[in-house]
Amino acid sequence: MIVQRVVLNSRPGKNGNPVAENFRMEEVYLPDNINEGQVQVRTLYLSVDPYMRCRMNEDTGTDYITPWQLSQVVDGGGIGIIEESKHTNLTKGDFVTSFYWPWQTKVILDGNSLEKVDPQLVDGHLSYFLGAIGMPGLTSLIGIQEKGHITAGSNKTMVVSGAAGACGSVAGQIGHFLGCSRVVGICGTHEKCILLTSELGFDAAINYKKDNVAEQLRESCPAGVDVYFDNVGGNISDTVISQMNENSHIILCGQISQYNKDVPYPPPLSPAIEAIQKERNITRERFLVLNYKDKFEPGILQLSQWFKEGKLKIKETVINGLENMGAAFQSMMTGGNIGKQIVCISEEISL
């Protein structure tokens, strides 16, 4: 059988901006037979995420993710349906997910590398397992639980940068659920600001491209900032940190403004901002959700419950077609998405 796949065509360079042309689509032969323990799956949805920018470099700069290889199939979060199985615990028609799903229309995988998912947890919206009820949602929930030091009724103010993205749009809502009295989002368009306050429960939103961020932050956070969920790094984070209170906490989720630059992760703070951090005893620790695998199952159930109760509002931006993976990635890296950026490969979930 002939199937389509996406491979890494070129690297943008450590300081380069990724473009759609860094990827290319090609056809490949898929064997007709599968071996014991394997399954043949049809890809339904694929995820593009900021961390993938590191995988485009020859050296990712981390020990927990490997680089993509030139002319080899690209992989990441994915959801699919099993079409044929020779694995004892997986049967035809099961929906499965993996963090290392090849960007390919159909693929033969080791069944042990897949996790079965229950469509009832997402009311049939399978793509949510790649977003708010998947790794981004878990990153937001566990990050806030482990590093935010929020308790019910603690009257804390939380600021979220990259607030209209996959993690940020969920993190702000969770901040309220867990006890923050005020949540302020920072994002890059007027449309996103309106969405945050009108649909996602943020108390205020700042457009960093138009507003004076320092001024708007003082207005929106009159009592200062107690918790900062940092998705972007760079100048925005410097501005937020300068308005943080004593003994406050930074949840270091991502640094998308720095991902196209050859700097260590997390990037060091400037001397002036580092001095503020030390003076005010602000904690700033790298947070890696993969270190909390024991919390994944209860976390998914909690996120699903909030969603089913109508409390957790889920936003996603969907592009159709494997041929658009590169365009979707480029768009996500430049803020073209609201909520989770998803690529729909096949919507046909019947066999």
From Swiss-Prot:
Designated name of the protein: Prostaglandin reductase 2
Species this protein is from: Homo sapiens (Human)
GO molecular function, one term: 15-oxoprostaglandin 13-oxidase [NAD(P)+] activity
Compartment(s) of residence: Cytoplasm
UniProt cross-references to Pfam families, sorted A to Z: ADH_N_2, ADH_zinc_N
Main location (coarse class): cytoplasm
Gene3D superfamilies named among the record's database cross-references: Medium-chain alcohol dehydrogenases, catalytic domain, NAD(P)-binding Rossmann-like Domain
UniProtKB keywords: Cytoplasm, Lipid metabolism, NADP, Oxidoreductase
